[in-house]
Protein backbone atom coordinates (compact mmCIF):
# COMPACT_ATOMS: atom_id res chain seq x y z
CA UNK A 1 0.00 0.00 0.00
CA UNK A 2 2.85 2.35 0.89
CA UNK A 3 4.51 1.56 -2.45
CA UNK A 4 1.37 2.45 -4.44
CA UNK A 5 0.86 5.60 -2.35
CA UNK A 6 4.47 6.64 -2.98
CA UNK A 7 4.11 6.13 -6.73
CA UNK A 8 0.80 8.07 -6.83
CA UNK A 9 2.27 10.85 -4.71
CA UNK A 10 5.28 11.10 -7.03
CA UNK A 11 2.90 11.15 -10.02
CA UNK A 12 0.79 13.93 -8.50
CA UNK A 13 3.86 15.95 -7.57
CA UNK A 14 5.40 15.42 -11.02
CA UNK A 15 2.15 16.29 -12.77
CA UNK A 16 1.74 19.44 -10.70
CA UNK A 17 5.32 20.51 -11.35
CA UNK A 18 5.01 19.78 -15.09
CA UNK A 19 1.71 21.63 -15.45
CA UNK A 20 2.90 24.62 -13.41
CA UNK A 21 6.18 24.74 -15.34
CA UNK A 22 4.37 24.99 -18.69
CA UNK A 23 1.80 27.40 -17.26
CA UNK A 24 4.54 29.69 -15.93
CA UNK A 25 6.46 29.39 -19.21
CA UNK A 26 3.38 30.43 -21.18
CA UNK A 27 2.71 33.33 -18.82
CA UNK A 28 6.34 34.40 -19.14
CA UNK A 29 5.75 34.95 -22.85
CA UNK A 30 3.72 38.04 -21.85
CA UNK A 31 4.56 38.82 -18.23
CA UNK A 32 5.91 40.90 -16.76
CA UNK A 33 5.21 43.78 -19.13
CA UNK A 34 8.19 45.76 -17.80
CA UNK A 35 11.65 44.93 -16.50
CA UNK A 36 11.90 44.33 -12.74
CA UNK A 37 14.98 45.57 -10.90
CA UNK A 38 16.34 44.39 -7.57
CA UNK A 39 19.26 46.31 -6.08
CA UNK A 40 19.65 48.07 -9.45
CA UNK A 41 20.01 44.71 -11.14
CA UNK A 42 17.48 43.60 -13.73
CA UNK A 43 15.98 40.27 -12.84
CA UNK A 44 16.38 37.54 -15.47
CA UNK A 45 13.46 36.93 -17.87
CA UNK A 46 12.04 40.42 -17.24
CA UNK A 47 10.27 41.75 -19.14
CA UNK A 48 8.51 38.81 -20.81
CA UNK A 49 9.53 37.54 -24.25
CA UNK A 50 6.84 39.32 -26.27
CA UNK A 51 7.15 42.68 -24.42
CA UNK A 52 10.93 42.49 -24.81
CA UNK A 53 10.83 41.60 -28.50
CA UNK A 54 7.72 43.60 -29.30
CA UNK A 55 9.33 45.91 -31.90
CA UNK A 56 11.17 43.05 -33.59
CA UNK A 57 7.98 40.99 -33.58
CA UNK A 58 5.98 43.80 -35.19
CA UNK A 59 8.67 44.33 -37.83
CA UNK A 60 8.91 40.64 -38.71
CA UNK A 61 5.13 40.19 -38.83
CA UNK A 62 4.95 43.14 -41.25
CA UNK A 63 7.60 41.59 -43.48
CA UNK A 64 5.93 38.17 -43.36
CA UNK A 65 2.54 39.66 -44.27
CA UNK A 66 3.97 41.47 -47.32
CA UNK A 67 6.31 38.66 -48.39
CA UNK A 68 3.94 35.73 -48.03
CA UNK A 69 0.37 36.98 -47.58
CA UNK A 70 -0.35 40.34 -49.20
CA UNK A 71 1.95 39.86 -52.17
CA UNK A 72 1.58 41.84 -55.40
CA UNK A 73 0.45 38.72 -57.26
CA UNK A 74 -2.11 37.87 -54.58
CA UNK A 75 -3.51 41.41 -54.60
CA UNK A 76 -3.62 41.49 -58.42
CA UNK A 77 -5.34 38.10 -58.58
CA UNK A 78 -7.92 39.20 -56.03
CA UNK A 79 -8.60 42.47 -57.84
CA UNK A 80 -9.13 40.65 -61.14
CA UNK A 81 -11.40 38.04 -59.55
CA UNK A 82 -14.78 38.08 -61.28
CA UNK A 83 -16.56 37.34 -58.02
CA UNK A 84 -15.07 40.44 -56.39
CA UNK A 85 -16.03 42.52 -59.41
CA UNK A 86 -19.59 41.20 -59.22
CA UNK A 87 -19.80 41.86 -55.47
CA UNK A 88 -18.61 45.45 -55.84
CA UNK A 89 -20.89 46.03 -58.83
CA UNK A 90 -23.91 44.64 -56.97
CA UNK A 91 -23.11 46.74 -53.89
CA UNK A 92 -22.75 49.97 -55.86
CA UNK A 93 -25.88 49.18 -57.90
CA UNK A 94 -27.85 48.60 -54.71
CA UNK A 95 -26.61 51.87 -53.25
CA UNK A 96 -27.46 53.67 -56.49
CA UNK A 97 -31.04 52.31 -56.47
CA UNK A 98 -31.42 53.39 -52.84
CA UNK A 99 -30.25 56.90 -53.66
CA UNK A 100 -32.59 57.04 -56.66
CA UNK A 101 -35.55 56.68 -54.28
CA UNK A 102 -34.62 59.99 -52.65
CA UNK A 103 -34.97 63.54 -53.93
CA UNK A 104 -31.70 65.37 -53.49
CA UNK A 105 -30.96 68.63 -55.30
CA UNK A 106 -27.40 69.69 -56.16
CA UNK A 107 -27.82 72.53 -53.66
CA UNK A 108 -28.67 70.07 -50.89
CA UNK A 109 -25.85 67.73 -51.85
CA UNK A 110 -23.28 70.54 -51.84
CA UNK A 111 -24.69 71.84 -48.55
CA UNK A 112 -24.20 68.36 -47.11
CA UNK A 113 -20.50 68.61 -47.98
CA UNK A 114 -20.23 72.03 -46.36
CA UNK A 115 -20.52 74.12 -49.53
CA UNK A 116 -22.96 76.91 -48.59
CA UNK A 117 -24.78 79.13 -51.14
CA UNK A 118 -23.59 76.80 -53.88
CA UNK A 119 -25.71 78.28 -56.67
CA UNK A 120 -24.70 81.90 -56.05
CA UNK A 121 -21.05 81.10 -55.49
CA UNK A 122 -20.87 78.77 -58.49
CA UNK A 123 -22.54 81.19 -60.88
CA UNK A 124 -20.40 84.07 -59.60
CA UNK A 125 -17.31 82.00 -60.28
CA UNK A 126 -18.60 80.97 -63.72
CA UNK A 127 -19.43 84.57 -64.61
CA UNK A 128 -16.01 85.89 -63.56
CA UNK A 129 -14.17 83.05 -65.26
CA UNK A 130 -16.21 83.34 -68.45
CA UNK A 131 -15.74 87.12 -68.69
CA UNK A 132 -12.02 86.72 -68.02
CA UNK A 133 -11.67 84.09 -70.74
CA UNK A 134 -13.62 86.16 -73.28
CA UNK A 135 -11.46 89.21 -72.53
CA UNK A 136 -8.34 87.05 -72.84
CA UNK A 137 -9.54 85.69 -76.18
CA UNK A 138 -10.36 89.14 -77.57
CA UNK A 139 -6.99 90.50 -76.43
CA UNK A 140 -4.78 87.67 -77.67
CA UNK A 141 -6.64 87.26 -80.97
CA UNK A 142 -7.15 90.93 -81.84
CA UNK A 143 -4.64 90.86 -84.74
CA UNK A 144 -5.89 87.53 -86.04
CA UNK A 145 -7.88 87.50 -89.25
CA UNK A 146 -11.44 86.26 -89.12
CA UNK A 147 -10.60 83.54 -91.64
CA UNK A 148 -8.22 82.06 -89.06
CA UNK A 149 -10.77 82.30 -86.25
CA UNK A 150 -13.64 80.67 -88.11
CA UNK A 151 -13.37 76.85 -88.10
CA UNK A 152 -12.62 75.38 -91.52
CA UNK A 153 -15.73 73.19 -91.42
CA UNK A 154 -17.96 76.18 -90.58
CA UNK A 155 -16.30 78.33 -93.26
CA UNK A 156 -16.84 75.64 -95.88
CA UNK A 157 -20.45 75.19 -94.77
CA UNK A 158 -21.15 78.94 -94.96
CA UNK A 159 -19.54 79.21 -98.40
CA UNK A 160 -21.70 76.41 -99.78
CA UNK A 161 -24.78 78.05 -98.26
CA UNK A 162 -24.30 81.39 -100.08
CA UNK A 163 -26.29 80.30 -103.20
CA UNK A 164 -29.13 79.24 -100.90
CA UNK A 165 -28.96 82.63 -99.20
CA UNK A 166 -29.19 84.27 -102.64
CA UNK A 167 -32.26 82.20 -103.47
CA UNK A 168 -33.85 83.16 -100.18
CA UNK A 169 -33.13 86.86 -100.73
CA UNK A 170 -34.62 86.86 -104.23
CA UNK A 171 -37.58 84.84 -102.97
CA UNK A 172 -38.25 87.36 -100.21
CA UNK A 173 -37.81 90.26 -102.66
CA UNK A 174 -40.27 88.67 -105.11
CA UNK A 175 -42.75 88.04 -102.33
CA UNK A 176 -42.53 91.63 -101.12
CA UNK A 177 -42.62 93.35 -104.53
CA UNK A 178 -45.60 91.26 -105.68
CA UNK A 179 -47.55 91.94 -102.50
CA UNK A 180 -50.03 94.73 -101.97
CA UNK A 181 -47.69 96.26 -99.45
CA UNK A 182 -44.93 96.30 -102.08
CA UNK A 183 -47.21 97.95 -104.56
CA UNK A 184 -48.12 100.66 -102.04
CA UNK A 185 -44.44 101.18 -101.21
CA UNK A 186 -43.60 101.64 -104.92
CA UNK A 187 -46.44 104.13 -105.33
CA UNK A 188 -45.30 106.12 -102.30
CA UNK A 189 -41.74 106.20 -103.62
CA UNK A 190 -42.97 107.54 -107.00
CA UNK A 191 -45.07 110.21 -105.32
CA UNK A 192 -42.11 111.25 -103.19
CA UNK A 193 -39.89 111.35 -106.27
CA UNK A 194 -42.25 113.69 -108.14
CA UNK A 195 -42.71 115.89 -105.08
CA UNK A 196 -38.96 116.29 -104.65
CA UNK A 197 -38.59 117.57 -108.24
CA UNK A 198 -40.92 120.53 -107.84
CA UNK A 199 -42.58 121.87 -110.98
CA UNK A 200 -40.97 119.29 -113.23
CA UNK A 201 -42.38 116.60 -111.05
CA UNK A 202 -45.81 118.19 -110.99
CA UNK A 203 -45.77 118.52 -114.76
CA UNK A 204 -44.74 114.87 -115.16
CA UNK A 205 -47.58 113.78 -112.92
CA UNK A 206 -50.03 115.44 -115.34
CA UNK A 207 -49.00 113.01 -118.07
CA UNK A 208 -48.42 109.92 -115.94
CA UNK A 209 -50.98 107.76 -114.16
CA UNK A 210 -49.33 106.90 -110.84
CA UNK A 211 -51.30 103.69 -110.36
CA UNK A 212 -50.57 102.22 -113.77
CA UNK A 213 -46.96 103.39 -113.62
CA UNK A 214 -46.58 101.72 -110.21
CA UNK A 215 -47.95 98.47 -111.61
CA UNK A 216 -45.55 98.71 -114.54
CA UNK A 217 -42.58 99.24 -112.25
CA UNK A 218 -43.81 96.36 -110.09
CA UNK A 219 -43.93 94.03 -113.09
CA UNK A 220 -40.53 95.10 -114.36
CA UNK A 221 -39.08 94.75 -110.88
CA UNK A 222 -40.36 91.18 -110.66
CA UNK A 223 -38.82 90.40 -114.04
CA UNK A 224 -35.51 91.92 -112.95
CA UNK A 225 -35.47 89.96 -109.69
CA UNK A 226 -36.23 86.71 -111.50
CA UNK A 227 -33.38 87.08 -113.98
CA UNK A 228 -30.35 84.81 -113.55
CA UNK A 229 -28.01 87.80 -113.88
CA UNK A 230 -29.63 89.40 -110.84
CA UNK A 231 -29.14 86.24 -108.81
CA UNK A 232 -25.51 86.01 -109.93
CA UNK A 233 -24.97 89.65 -108.99
CA UNK A 234 -26.44 89.14 -105.51
CA UNK A 235 -24.40 85.97 -105.04
CA UNK A 236 -21.25 87.80 -106.17
CA UNK A 237 -21.95 90.66 -103.75
CA UNK A 238 -22.47 88.23 -100.88
CA UNK A 239 -19.26 86.36 -101.75
CA UNK A 240 -17.29 89.61 -101.93
CA UNK A 241 -18.64 90.81 -98.60
CA UNK A 242 -17.88 87.44 -97.03
CA UNK A 243 -14.29 87.54 -98.32
CA UNK A 244 -13.91 91.10 -97.03
CA UNK A 245 -15.22 89.98 -93.66
CA UNK A 246 -12.76 87.08 -93.52
CA UNK A 247 -9.86 89.36 -94.41
CA UNK A 248 -10.54 91.72 -91.51
CA UNK A 249 -8.73 91.43 -88.20
CA UNK A 250 -10.76 90.92 -85.04
CA UNK A 251 -9.79 94.37 -83.72
CA UNK A 252 -11.34 96.00 -86.82
CA UNK A 253 -14.71 94.53 -85.89
CA UNK A 254 -14.26 94.87 -82.13
CA UNK A 255 -12.07 97.87 -81.17
CA UNK A 256 -9.95 97.52 -78.04
CA UNK A 257 -11.96 100.13 -76.12
CA UNK A 258 -15.13 98.10 -76.64
CA UNK A 259 -13.72 94.68 -75.72
CA UNK A 260 -14.49 94.86 -72.00
CA UNK A 261 -18.05 96.05 -72.65
CA UNK A 262 -18.64 93.30 -75.22
CA UNK A 263 -17.17 90.65 -72.90
CA UNK A 264 -19.52 91.80 -70.14
CA UNK A 265 -22.53 91.71 -72.47
CA UNK A 266 -21.69 88.26 -73.83
CA UNK A 267 -21.14 86.93 -70.32
CA UNK A 268 -24.44 88.39 -69.12
CA UNK A 269 -26.33 86.90 -72.07
CA UNK A 270 -24.76 83.48 -71.60
CA UNK A 271 -25.46 83.47 -67.86
CA UNK A 272 -29.09 84.43 -68.45
CA UNK A 273 -29.43 81.71 -71.08
CA UNK A 274 -27.92 79.05 -68.80
CA UNK A 275 -30.70 77.32 -66.76
CA UNK A 276 -28.77 77.43 -63.48
CA UNK A 277 -31.85 77.70 -61.26
CA UNK A 278 -33.27 74.48 -62.67
CA UNK A 279 -29.87 72.81 -62.56
CA UNK A 280 -29.25 73.55 -58.87
CA UNK A 281 -32.80 73.07 -57.57
CA UNK A 282 -34.06 70.10 -59.57
CA UNK A 283 -33.53 66.72 -57.84
CA UNK A 284 -30.55 64.86 -59.22
CA UNK A 285 -32.71 61.73 -59.35
CA UNK A 286 -35.10 63.45 -61.79
CA UNK A 287 -32.21 64.35 -64.09
CA UNK A 288 -30.89 60.78 -63.97
CA UNK A 289 -34.25 59.02 -64.20
CA UNK A 290 -34.07 58.51 -67.95
CA UNK A 291 -30.57 57.07 -67.72
CA UNK A 292 -31.12 54.80 -64.70
CA UNK A 293 -31.13 51.56 -66.70
CA UNK A 294 -28.05 52.55 -68.70
CA UNK A 295 -26.19 53.52 -65.53
CA UNK A 296 -26.93 50.24 -63.72
CA UNK A 297 -26.43 47.99 -66.74
CA UNK A 298 -23.47 49.66 -68.43
CA UNK A 299 -21.88 52.57 -66.57
CA UNK A 300 -21.45 50.97 -63.12
CA UNK A 301 -20.11 47.58 -64.38
CA UNK A 302 -17.77 49.36 -66.80
CA UNK A 303 -16.54 51.80 -64.13
CA UNK A 304 -15.93 49.00 -61.61
CA UNK A 305 -14.09 46.90 -64.19
CA UNK A 306 -11.91 49.84 -65.26
CA UNK A 307 -11.22 50.82 -61.65
CA UNK A 308 -10.18 47.32 -60.58
CA UNK A 309 -8.14 46.86 -63.75
CA UNK A 310 -6.35 50.15 -63.11
CA UNK A 311 -5.60 49.25 -59.48
CA UNK A 312 -4.45 45.76 -60.50
CA UNK A 313 -2.18 47.17 -63.21
CA UNK A 314 -0.59 49.58 -60.76
CA UNK A 315 -0.74 47.25 -57.75
CA UNK A 316 3.05 47.02 -57.47
CA UNK A 317 3.41 50.78 -57.29
CA UNK A 318 0.45 51.09 -54.91
CA UNK A 319 1.81 48.42 -52.55
CA UNK A 320 5.21 50.07 -52.64
CA UNK A 321 3.79 53.51 -51.89
CA UNK A 322 1.52 52.17 -49.14
CA UNK A 323 4.50 50.37 -47.53
CA UNK A 324 2.27 47.62 -46.14
CA UNK A 325 5.08 46.15 -44.04
CA UNK A 326 5.49 49.45 -42.23
CA UNK A 327 1.72 49.82 -41.96
CA UNK A 328 1.34 46.41 -40.29
CA UNK A 329 4.33 47.12 -38.04
CA UNK A 330 2.86 50.47 -36.99
CA UNK A 331 -0.57 48.99 -36.29
CA UNK A 332 0.88 46.17 -34.17
CA UNK A 333 3.03 48.69 -32.30
CA UNK A 334 -0.13 50.62 -31.38
CA UNK A 335 -1.54 47.59 -29.56
CA UNK A 336 -1.03 47.65 -25.80
CA UNK A 337 0.62 44.59 -24.28
CA UNK A 338 -2.62 43.46 -22.58
CA UNK A 339 -4.36 43.71 -25.97
CA UNK A 340 -1.68 41.58 -27.63
CA UNK A 341 -1.92 39.02 -24.82
CA UNK A 342 -5.70 38.94 -25.10
CA UNK A 343 -5.49 38.55 -28.88
CA UNK A 344 -3.05 35.62 -28.69
CA UNK A 345 -5.06 33.92 -25.93
CA UNK A 346 -8.32 34.32 -27.89
CA UNK A 347 -6.74 32.80 -30.97
CA UNK A 348 -4.77 29.95 -29.36
CA UNK A 349 -6.20 29.69 -25.82
CA UNK A 350 -7.28 26.09 -26.32
CA UNK A 351 -3.83 25.06 -27.57
CA UNK A 352 -2.13 26.86 -24.67
CA UNK A 353 -4.34 24.96 -22.21
CA UNK A 354 -3.48 21.69 -23.95
CA UNK A 355 0.23 22.53 -23.55
CA UNK A 356 -0.36 23.07 -19.82
CA UNK A 357 -2.25 19.76 -19.57
CA UNK A 358 0.46 18.02 -21.57
CA UNK A 359 3.05 19.31 -19.09
CA UNK A 360 0.97 17.84 -16.26
CA UNK A 361 0.64 14.49 -18.03
CA UNK A 362 4.34 14.29 -18.82
CA UNK A 363 5.19 15.39 -15.26
CA UNK A 364 2.86 12.72 -13.84
CA UNK A 365 4.35 10.06 -16.11
CA UNK A 366 7.87 11.08 -15.06
CA UNK A 367 6.73 11.02 -11.40
CA UNK A 368 5.46 7.44 -11.83
CA UNK A 369 8.78 6.39 -13.34
CA UNK A 370 10.64 8.10 -10.51
CA UNK A 371 8.41 6.35 -7.93
CA UNK A 372 9.02 2.93 -9.51
CA UNK A 373 12.76 3.54 -9.71
CA UNK A 374 12.79 4.73 -6.09
CA UNK A 375 11.33 1.37 -5.01
CA UNK A 376 14.10 -0.51 -6.76
CA UNK A 377 16.98 1.55 -5.43
Swiss-Prot record:
Q: Which Gene Ontology terms of cellular component type are present? A: plasma membrane
Q: Which UniProt keywords apply?
A: Cell membrane, Membrane, Transmembrane, Transmembrane helix
User: Where does this protein reside within or beyond the cell?
Assistant: Cell membrane
The answer on whether this UniProt entry bears the keyword Membrane reads: yes
Topology with respect to the bilayer: Multi-pass membrane protein
The regions listed as transmembrane in this protein's record are 1-21, 357-377
Q: Which Pfam families match?
A: DUF445
Describe the family membership recorded for this protein in Swiss-Prot or TrEMBL.
Answer: Belongs to the UPF0754 family.
Q: What is this protein called?
A: UPF0754 membrane protein Lm4b_02251
Identify the species of origin. Listeria monocytogenes serotype 4b (strain CLIP80459)
Upper classification of the organism: Bacteria, Bacillati, Bacillota, Bacilli, Bacillales
Amino acid sequence: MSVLFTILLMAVIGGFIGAMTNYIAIRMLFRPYKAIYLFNKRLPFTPGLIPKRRDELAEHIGKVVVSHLLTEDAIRARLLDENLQKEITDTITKMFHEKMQLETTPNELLHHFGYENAEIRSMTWVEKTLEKEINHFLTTKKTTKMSDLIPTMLESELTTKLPHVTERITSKMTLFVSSEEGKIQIKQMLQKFFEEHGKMGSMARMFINIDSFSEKIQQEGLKLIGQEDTKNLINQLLTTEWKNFEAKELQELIPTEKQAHLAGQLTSELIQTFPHEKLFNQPIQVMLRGYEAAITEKVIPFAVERMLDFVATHSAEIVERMDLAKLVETQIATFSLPEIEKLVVEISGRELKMITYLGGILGGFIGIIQGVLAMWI
